């Protein structure tokens, strides 16, 4: 619901076949790049409480996380879900051509980042993406499902709707994280910079002054 600032939350929901709302998750990261207007309508989800909840709906047989779109670019999100015991992360997404650089095809980069986050956190990634056109944006579809080994199990075309079906062996998560124990060998005591806000005048990191902050 909108707060005093008039902004709402971008929220992913899970609905049972009966129509019952069984889970929801607030989007935690809001894009502010040129040509994006999401921050005009939505604010980031609250960090207090449990910002990365893991759900186990009846009948599904799996523990899932449900971040949204821009969240998928942040490895910290996938890692947080993995630490919370998620086996599958579902990213409802609406991404396509860049508003300011329409000829720049980010589809391969988008997919590589998500697959890589699944590898380094031992997760299955289920990523439905929008297709079609709206205004100056052409959404590039390409919805896909990947496993912890980095294999894309099934993928939709860029320019048409599709239903994707894949068999997921959830034991692969355990096997992968035993082979590569990323969670056990973390060094959270050394990650202080990750929890320190970035100065808007130094958006490229410490020691780099910004010439302008594009909005």
Per-region residue spans from a language model:
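Active-site catalytic loop in hydrolytic enzyme cores
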Residues: 3-93, 97-113, 179-181
């Amino acid at each position: 619901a909108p707060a005093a600032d008039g902004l709402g939350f971008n929220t992913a929901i899970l609905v049972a076949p009966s129509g019952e709302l069984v889970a929801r998750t607030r989007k935690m990261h809001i894009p502010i790049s040129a040509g994006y207007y999401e921050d005009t309508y939505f604010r980031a989800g609250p960090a207090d409480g449990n910002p990365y909840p893991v759900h186990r709906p009846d009948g599904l047989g799996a523990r899932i996380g449900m971040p949204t779109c821009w969240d998928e670019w942040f490895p910290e999100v996938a890692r947080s879900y993995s630490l919370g015991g998620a086996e599958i992360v579902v990213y409802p997404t609406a991404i396509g051509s860049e508003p300011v650089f329409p000829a720049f095809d980010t589809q391969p980069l988008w997919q590589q980042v998500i697959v890589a986050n699944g590898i380094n956190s031992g997760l299955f990634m289920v990523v439905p993406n929008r297709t079609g056109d709206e205004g100056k944006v052409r959404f590039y579809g390409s919805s896909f499902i990947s496993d912890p080994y980095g294999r894309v199990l099934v993928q939709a075309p860029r320019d048409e709707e599709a239903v994707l079906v894949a068999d997921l062996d959830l034991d692969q998560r355990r096997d992968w994280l035993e082979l590569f124990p990323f969670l056990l060998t973390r060094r959270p005591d050394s990650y202080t910079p990750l929890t320190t806000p970035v100065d808007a005048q130094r958006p490229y990191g410490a020691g780099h002054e910004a010439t302008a902050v594009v909005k």
